Amino acid sequence: MRIIFAFLLFASFSLQAQEKKPGKPKWRIDKNKIITGSLVLVAGSAKGFNETLHFNYKAFENTFPGINENWFNPQVSWRNKYKGGDPDNGPKFFLSTSAFVMFTDQYHLNNFINRAAIMSALVIKIGEGKKPFKHYLLDLLFYTVCHQVGFAATYYPFTARSSK
């Protein structure tokens, strides 16, 4: 009996009556942020590609000679959504001027990719739950950097070529 009593006495010293209070949650780059950050990077790349096509098309054309101007050049490709390239003839195919415009030229495809990637990242982030305000600020900084890296990767190489 004394052995059991001694065992229970020693066991009680090692048991805790209260749960440990979890420490402050730390901001980390987890799987969720990698996925959503990648989507935002793709959105930034699409935006940078659009800006390149719109403002530095000559440098883009010099870098990729022989490209299809009817697909890539926004000054020409906007006509792809119309029959015979003439707005007076009406749409080239059903919803080619609205819902399916992304299938008519690169400029509209880039816009679609940009919006789809941003919206996908947003939908994934909505399910995360509450967190400290500081984490929202860090998320804002993280996603801004992701977007700018994507933008810079597809825009600045062509601005450097066009200034030469």
Language-model regions, residue ranges each:
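Bacterial Sec-dependent N-terminal signal peptides
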Residues: 1-25
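Hydrophobic alpha-helical membrane segments
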Residues: 19-164
